[in-house]
Amino acid sequence: MRLLIPSLIFLEALGLCLAKATTVQWCAVSNSEEEKCLRWQNEMRKVGGPPLSCVKKSSTRQCIQAIVTNRADAMTLDGGTMFDAGKPPYKLRPVAAEVYGTKEQPRTHYYAVAVVKNSSNFHLNQLQGLRSCHTGIGRSAGWKIPIGTLRPYLNWNGPPASLEEAVSKFFSKSCVPGAQKDRFPNLCSSCAGTGANKCASSPEEPYSGYAGALRCLRDNAGDVAFTRGSTVFEELPNKAERDQYKLLCPDNTWKPVTEYKECHLAQVPSHAVVSRSTNDKEEAIWELLRQSQEKFGKKQASGFQLFASPSGQKDLLFKESAIGFVRVPQKVDVGLYLTFSYTTSIQNLNKKQQDVIASKARVTWCAVGSEEKRKCDQWNRASRGRVTCISFPTTEDCIVAIMKGDADAMSLDGGYIYTAGKCGLVPVLAENQKSSKSNGLDCVNRPVEGYLAVAAVRREDAGFTWSSLRGKKSCHTAVDRTAGWNIPMGLLANQTRSCKFNEFFSQSCAPGADPKSNLCALCIGDEKGENKCAPNSKERYQGYTGALRCLAEKAGNVAFLKDSTVLQNTDGKNTEEWARNLKLKDFELLCLDDTRKPVTEAKNCHLAIAPNHAVVSRTDKVEVLQQVLLDQQVQFGRNGQRCPGEFCLFQSKTKNLLFNDNTECLAKIPGKTTSEKYLGKEYVIATERLKQCSSSPLLEACAFLTQ
């Protein structure tokens, strides 16, 4: 989501309409906050704005409880408190984020980074014994985030042992303004203040704050500075000076200071207005905030200022540094809003050492639907717990789980790799199929070739070609998948100049579409007739094999899938009842030149070459995940030591569960560390064009989170 500057008022269609006169109950935690709230209420009444009432409680915790029980509706929380408020039993969610910065450069978060001199030859996992510079004790960018990140390397078993003592022993010298210099003198030994001001958490200590931590590094009082990414630019406007520094990345690489959005310890979120996750008053809350910032925001002539507090007071109701609000997309809950890196850093400070180490070594796989979960549970048992499992109904749910750290990995097709990449995930290993150009010994290091996306038809169903598909019935693997949706529908959209896919075909089965639409009319659900059009294996026409089944059972006239699907399910290769008598010769392919060809001639008759499926994860998990999966496939891969005797990664009872069944191995993908590099420029451009045809709540959420 982009900030619409200069107004900073996001006038959505709903916001332009007259909102219902629903009273928003704002929760205040002090007499001063209540006084400001009552004045806000009075000023809104004067200008005919949305109704507001004020509720006073004695603590933030009591306000949270009041919101849960409908005795209040909204309040503003910082990240740490929001972390607790988002969990059961409260389950509050962010409705609007405070915006900081300027109209020209607004921001809803900042990046906590580790800065070193360009001549440094150490990585983030090699800081022990070096000198450190911090913004201050207990502060996010200078303490909580870096120390939480370094938690696995500290000789600290967790509470109640002193964290400060462990840090003082980890670094040789430090400046941590605000630390107890009598108890932990090493934490103050690098500070530059004099007398009582040495190590003070105030401007009197030259090395205090964001700029101070960087100054500590520049003065050679430390080897690494933990500060804010933008601080380097604020303090070093000269490019030649900036180029003398670089960043330490969580994956133990270096990047230029200009790339702090890609190389940071955590993204620290701004304060946010929270409410109940039931969404009963979200529209009213946003309309109140929208009109309030328009009438009483920064630089308004009104005597009442929304982002100001009386003399002697600070940050009443909202941060005084805020310049406005931005609406938080519905898909963004507290876990997504706070980001994995932020929440993990905070959580690590409350964990035992062995738990932190165990969580970093463990891989949690995300399974889509019950059948994938069953196979994953078998993998869990065979791996002796090295791989654990979690399950969600849809692929997008799994992508969100990986973003939040509830899961670590899954294998995706190109369409979902595109989505995952927009959400900050990266490809780790690619599914590699057999190649006629080489033997299986080089599979792990062999470049992936991609697969052929085709339009399959029954040979007997003659009389139509690619250009005469309009009005036919279609079978798709699922919405947003490569061979089954992105490629064919992208081609059709370009040809017809229309996004009305539900009108192009008379009926379809496109799992993941609106169940009430024509795009789901051919779907059959599970054996009980339930879960119709579900984007998982409960829909029997879902996936490559499901799309072929839809065609074979004469529900559809054309199936969009990959060429190998037909080869793997005909002439006795699939013994399921629906496929038992299928013959390869009974199917043909539609070519873009309006001819038909046998399936065996797919190289000369396909819609596009599609990128192979790939395993995706967060950047912090790449190294561990690659090690674990390469070890697992030695044991359970094709011709593995314990396959087929115990478990096989690339075999499925009902086809293509977790991985494609025709996968020979999971292969390394050097040099393709982002989804865009892996997918290729042409595929990305084509997918972006197709995405213009529809809205995606997940892509909207990820655009907001990565802006």
Swiss-Prot record:
Hydrogencarbonate 1 binds at residues 135, 139, 141-142. Hydrogencarbonate 2 binds at residues 477, 481, 483-484. SMART domains: TR_FER. Fe(3+) 1 binds at residues 78, 110, 210, 271. It is found in: Secreted; Cytoplasmic granule. Poly-N-acetyllactosaminic carbohydrate moiety seems to be needed for TLR4 activation. Keywords: Disulfide bond, Glycoprotein, Hydrolase, Immunity, Ion transport, Iron, Iron transport, Metal-binding, Osteogenesis, Protease, Repeat, Secreted, Serine protease, Signal, Transport. Pfam families: Transferrin (PF00405). GO terms for biological process: antibacterial humoral response; antifungal humoral response; antimicrobial humoral immune response mediated by antimicrobial peptide; bone morphogenesis; defense response to Gram-negative bacterium; innate immune response in mucosa; iron ion transport; killing of cells of another organism. GO terms for cellular component: cell surface; cytoplasm; extracellular space; protein-containing complex; secretory granule; specific granule. Transferrins are iron binding transport proteins which can bind two Fe(3+) ions in association with the binding of an anion, usually bicarbonate. Lactoferricin binds to the bacterial surface and is crucial for the bactericidal functions. Has some antiviral activity against papillomavirus infection. N-terminal region shows strong antifungal activity against C.albicans. Contains two BBXB heparin-binding consensus sequences that appear to form the predominate functional GAG-binding site. This is Lactotransferrin. It comes from Mus musculus. The lineage of its organism: Eukaryota, Metazoa, Chordata, Craniata, Vertebrata.
